[in-house]
Swiss-Prot record:
One GO CC annotation: cytoplasm
Species, as recorded: Staphylococcus xylosus
Keyword Repeat part of the UniProt annotation: yes
A molecular-function term among this protein's GO annotations: serine O-acetyltransferase activity
Membrane-crossing segments per the record: none
Similarity field: Belongs to the transferase hexapeptide repeat family.
Subcellular location: Cytoplasm
Protein name: Serine acetyltransferase
Main enzyme class: transferase
Residue ranges of coiled coil: none
One BP annotation, GO: cysteine biosynthetic process from serine
This protein's UniProt keywords: Acyltransferase, Amino-acid biosynthesis, Cysteine biosynthesis, Cytoplasm, Repeat, Transferase
Length: 216
């Protein structure tokens, strides 16, 4: 019981550290869906370890209904996990998450197919995964990594790295920029790039640089 209360205290403190909108302990305990999902998972995970699979899964599904956050009862979660906003977060069965991790809404820690066994990612300590990011497969995100919004990460990432894009690629490691770096405001828009290319092709057609071989 004391261990569980210590866990609650640590989780509440993590919210205050990560969310400037948090005002009081009562507000965090009563109003933050992310902490509700984590605390519910602690119970479901204990039942899962005792092979009470149906009851564990039932708790998980009820929690998803009320919070919008789906954590499989088999997932292993470290201390001070903060799920901010949380709607649409999915954490798979064989996922392992370290301490002091922050996850935003729409994040998926999932698999890449129907294989059995270890098929979900491992997340190290002090990792931040921004809104909408997908981390897929049996890969390792090492400690102190930042993953940008809407990134799709399919390969393991070394410590002290920043990853953005689809597919995810490292733009900063050990404090040094690698290649061309984009912040969230300047990430490339693939649709815009395709439209620009189409405009170039149309301009070439108008100028006679491209001959139309079709006869109508």
């Amino acid at each position: 019981m004391f261990k569980f209360l210590k866990r609650i205290k640590d989780d509440v403190n993590m919210v205050f550290e990560q969310d400037p909108a948090a005002r009081t302990t009562l507000e965090v305990i009563t109003s933050y869906a992310g902490v509700h999902a984590v605390w519910s998972h602690l119970i479901a995970h204990e039942l899962y370890k005792k092979k009470k699979y149906v009851l564990a899964r039932l708790i998980s599904q009820v929690t998803r209904f009320f919070t919008g956050i789906e954590i499989h009862p088999g997932a292993q979660i470290g201390r001070r996990l903060f799920i901010d906003h949380g709607m649409g977060v999915v954490i798979g069965e064989t996922c392992r998450i370290g301490d002091n991790v922050t996850i935003y809404q729409g994040v998926t820690l999932g698999g890449t197919g129907k294989e059995r066994g270890k098929r979900h990612p491992d997340i190290g300590d002090n990792v931040l995964i921004a809104a909408g990011a997908k981390v897929l497969g049996n890969i390792t995100i090492n400690a102190n990594v930042n993953i940008g919004a809407n990134s799709v990460v399919l390969n393991s990432v070394p410590s002290y790295s920043t990853v953005v894009g689809i597919p995810g690629h490292i733009v900063k490691q050990d404090g040094r920029r690698i290649g061309k770096t984009f912040d969230h405001r300047n990430l490339p828009d693939p649709i815009y790039e395709q439209l620009k290319e189409l405009e170039k092709q149309l301009e070439k057609t108008r100028n006679g640089e491209i001959q139309d071989d079709y006869i109508i």
